[in-house]
Amino acid sequence: MKETLIFDLSRKGRQGHRIASLDIEPQPAINLIPEKFLRTEPADLPEVPESEVVRHFIRLSNLNHHVDKDMYPLGSCTMKYNPKINDQTADIAGFTSIHPLQPAETAQGTLQLMYELGEMLREIAGMAAITLQPAAGAHGELTGILMIRKYHDSRASKRTKLLVVDSAHGTNPASAALVGYDILSVKSNAEGRTDIEDLKAKLDENVAALMLTNPNTIGLFEKDIKEIEQLVHDNGSLLYMDGANMNALMGITRPGDMGFDIVHYNLHKTFSAPHGGGGPGSGPVGVCDKLKPYLPVPVIEKHDDGNTSRYTLTTDRPLSIGRMMNFYGNFSVMVRAYTYIRMLGAEGIRRVSENAIINANYLLSKLIDRYDLPYPKPVMHEFCLSGDRQKKQHNVRTLDIAKRLLDLGFHAPTIYFPLIVSEALMIEPTETETRETLDRFAEAMLQIADETENSPETVQNAPQFTPVKRLDEAQASRKLNICCPGC
């Protein structure tokens, strides 16, 4: 049933609460507010009792799909279940009542948590130093690329180009362009991995760095990474790893050991904080030893004084790229990530990645006979199918398949990305899904494959059972209208 707008529930004179009479003379609010701040006409606010407000938003929440409701297989997004203990620790009063401008000596517990989180992340990725400031993955990319530019500038090397592998995470070219680099794309080979010969052809004295994602966005590990690392470093360039797919690597291998100079993490993805709907996110950046001087300020430092430790915020870094935020990053996400890592421990962190890989390969084995796999298996934590067969034989597009999944109770995978896969369906089940849930999702995908062959119009006209049927997404993007009636 379609849910009405809160404004349509409004009836003149209805109130949520009535306040009991007071013993003191009431003052009209307009007498307490300077005239320059007063509205010239009343706000058009809905008049709805509290019970109806609560029911309205509960009904709306039930229309949403989220990871607490069912599987959310959005490729390259790591929509894992987030343990509720993470939220409980993030809500501790000592963390929620602090202010970023208060003296460091009065926030020692907060600084200790941030320092220890940085040390754990540094160890997981095998890097020399870290900043927690960036507010999201793409913000981490921007931070890393600014450090790349500062590194080359400090060596009087005015490099103008940045290479991005075509299977890398989608925000990489945009982040590099923001810093002013010319972007060159490095092709993938027939295996879906970086084409070494194309890389060699594009490496020259003007290349500042190579950006790639490992595993890449079709779920394949770059098995030639040591050769890639050697080529890049022999050219005087830096090697950047997008950590979007770090969920496949934890405790198994480390970017620093592969030779990466910079890596950014996504705490909201790999380290289990709720994300989607605009955040908050957190995109810490780890660097090798030679890039430590360029890290954003302030830097948290630990000082051991006998039996106690104290933590300070240091800004005396003359080669630093400066601040990336007004303050120190999205702290509530850091608390959740810290809780997650401490709860799992080293063995648990490795088990997360092992189970993510097992789940992806298990699900792929259930679907591979009915959907095309453009590149060879095995995969890591995610895989990318193609809907080419369905489109060519039955005129059913990947978009149709994704919409039909909504009818069957699942969120759709990432579609039409990466661009190197035609009619792409990128699926990441994560480690937190049970075998039974994976089987249910596989059954839904196989049902859609059957419908594509026997009644393609069922898939082409999906969704039929959602509160809103198929939207004209192109028109919605071009002619955005977010105003309620009467606004």
From Swiss-Prot:
Task: Name positions with the PTM N6-(pyridoxal phosphate)lysine.
Answer: 269
One family name in Pfam for this protein: Aminotran_5
- Give the top-level enzyme category: oxidoreductase
GO MF entries: glycine binding; glycine dehydrogenase (decarboxylating) activity; pyridoxal phosphate binding
Keyword annotations of the record: Oxidoreductase, Pyridoxal phosphate
List, alphabetically, the GO terms of the cellular component aspect: cytosol; glycine cleavage complex
Could you identify this protein by its name?
Probable glycine dehydrogenase (decarboxylating) subunit 2
List the top taxonomic levels of the source: Bacteria, Pseudomonadati, Chlorobiota, Chlorobiia, Chlorobiales
